[in-house]
Amino acid sequence: MLPNKKFFSPGWYFQKARLRFAKALLDLGIPLKFTSQIDDFQIQFVTTSLLEYSLRAQKSYTRERVTMGWLRNFVGAGDVVYDIGANVGAYSLYAGKKLKSSTGRVYAFEPAFFNFSALCKNIEVNWLNDIVLPFPVAFTAVSGPDKLFLSSTISGSALHAVGKKESEGKSFAPRFTQGVLSS
C-alpha cells in the first residue's frame, strides 16, 4: 500500500537518492560533471565537493534572482563584466555564454586557491577561455600582500576574509590561511 498522497512524493525520494549517490562518488574522490540548463545555455560544471555539486552547480541560477535579473537584462554584446568573488564561476560562465559571439569579456576574480582551481576548470570545459579570464586576486581597501583566512577549504565554499578573521561581522577560526595579493 502506498503512503498517504499528501506525504508521498516519488520525485523527492529520487532526488535524495541521486544526492546520496553523488556524495558517495565525491567522497571517493571522483569528480562529477553537472550540466545546468539556464535560458538558452547549457553550462557545465566539474564538481569535486557536495557543496559545489548541490549548491553552486544546481542552484546558483535560482538562488540569486537579482544577480540573474541583472545579467539577463543588462549584459549584452561587447560588454565587459567584472565578477568579483567569482567562486567556481557560475555567473562568469553565464555571462561568458551570453557574450560568446561578441567582443565582450568577463574578468573573474577569485582569491581562494580551491575555488580558483574549480573556476579555471569550469571555464575550460565550457570552452570560454577566450572570453572569461580568471585572476587569483582579492579586492580590499588596501593594495598589496595580505592574508586570506579561509573558513573552509571545500570547493564552492564562501565567507572567507582578508586581513581579519571576520566574515559578515562574525569572528571565525580559519581552517587555512593563504597568502593573497589585494588590489
Predicted features and spans:
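S-adenosyl-L-methionine
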Residues: 1-183
